[in-house]
C-alpha cells in the first residue's frame, strides 16, 4: 500500500458511512484504511465491520476501550505500512482527489 489512511471513531454512527465512502471513492486507489474504534457505544463498530467485509483494504481495529484520539492515532501509525500516512475524522468527508493530489505533491518535493 502506498498510503495508509486512519479514521479514529467514537460514536460516529450517523456520519461514518459518508466518511468511509469518501475514502473508497478516491481517484487514487493504492491505499489501506484503518478504522480505529475508540470504544463506541452506538452502531459505529457494525458499520466499520460491514465495510471491512466488502473491501480488503479496510481494516477494523477494536479493543472495546475508550482511550482517546491521540492514543488511537498513534496506534494506527504504529501499524501503518504505507509510504505516506493520512488521517481524517469520522465526521469528515474526503475530497475525491485529495489523496491523489497529496501524493503528487509529496512525490514532487
Spans of model-derived segments:
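Nucleotide-sugar donor-binding/catalytic module of glycosyltransferases
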Residues: 1-109
Amino acid at each position: 500500500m502506498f498510503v495508509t489512511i486512519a479514521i479514529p471513531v467514537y460514536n460516529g454512527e450517523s456520519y461514518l458511512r459518508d466518511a468511509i465512502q469518501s475514502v473508497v471513492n478516491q481517484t487514487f486507489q493504492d491505499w489501506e484504511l484503518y478504522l480505529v474504534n475508540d470504544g463506541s457505544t452506538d452502531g459505529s463498530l457494525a458499520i466499520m465491520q460491514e465495510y471491512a467485509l466488502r473491501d480488503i483494504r479496510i481494516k477494523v481495529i477494536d479493543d472495546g476501550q475508550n482511550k482517546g484520539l491521540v492514543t488511537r492515532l498513534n496506534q494506527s501509525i504504529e501499524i501503518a505500512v504505507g509510504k505516506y500516512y493520512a488521517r481524517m475524522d469520522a465526521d469528515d468527508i474526503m475530497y475525491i482527489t485529495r489523496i491523489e493530489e497529496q501524493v503528487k505533491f509529496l512525490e514532487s518535493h
